[in-house]
Amino acid sequence: MTRSDEEAVVEIYRAENRAMVERDQATLERILAETMTLTHMTGYVQPRQEWIAQIMDGKMKYYSSTEERVFDVVVEGDQASLVGQNRVKASVWGGGVSIWPLQMRVNLKRQAGRCQIVSQVASTY
């Protein structure tokens, strides 16, 4: 594991957060594996395509995501993981706008020459 491997993994996480706010479908589709799942704080396990669709249609509207901390970055072979903590301003599934201290446990895998997010679990911190 090199420092540049760790930096590349962190940059994917940061790109995802930017893409959520910017509603950048192309970036999300590029960095999220087709089989990616997002486990929400409610326990709901959401498939990649449904999550992207809800970002695009505004059911999940992200206004901002301010990074506070990224830690436990591990790269081993073709797998990687990290924990990110961001203050996320969003309105979700018809609720009002709130700011959450959102922690994401992110797992990534190198496939076909590129590293993609394969699973994520959300909680608060």
Where are these regions (language model features)?
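Outer-membrane beta-barrel domain signature
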Residues: 93-95
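Amphipathic alpha-helical repeat scaffolds
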Residues: 10, 17-18
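A solvent-exposed, acidic/Ser-Thr-rich amphipathic alpha-helical stretch
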Residues: 3-7, 25-75, 85, 98-99
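Short beta-strand edge/turn micro-motifs at domain boundaries
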Residues: 81, 100-125
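Short helix-adjacent coil turns
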Residues: 16, 23-24
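Generic structural detector for well-ordered beta-strands
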Residues: 72-74, 89, 107-109
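Generic short beta-strand segments
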Residues: 84-91
